Amino acid sequence: MIQSGVGMTSARTRERLVLRLAEKGISNVRVLDRFRAIPRHIFIEEALSSRAYEDKALPIGAGQTISQPLIVASKVQELLKDKTLDFKYKKILEIGSGCGFQSAILSGIAEHVYGVERIYSLVKKSSNLIRK
């Protein structure tokens, strides 16, 4: 499916981010597993890939940013609060889907994720990435 990469884009680097999220209070296994599964570096410019797994918002073009991982994880954890491990939402609508990273994270907890984005260049980029 999606390549693991090497160095700063490897599965081991993603695991370090997951451990930092857990240290900051993200305890839902499904949320942490989504961060293990989705390579954040493919959603940002290659020049910034060495910073992809920092817990920071990063520019994605058109004056927009990819959200800080802790913010994304906190929102998804809240969505799953009091839900069983096998629970899936039927539909989730994400307004301002940007590069598609959060939509990819959400795809593990919903049957269908619909993203709305007003900036065409981001729509085009995220559509291509989500198909992978």
Feature map (PLM): residue ranges:
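Alpha-helix N-capping/helix-start residues
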Residues: 28-29, 69, 120
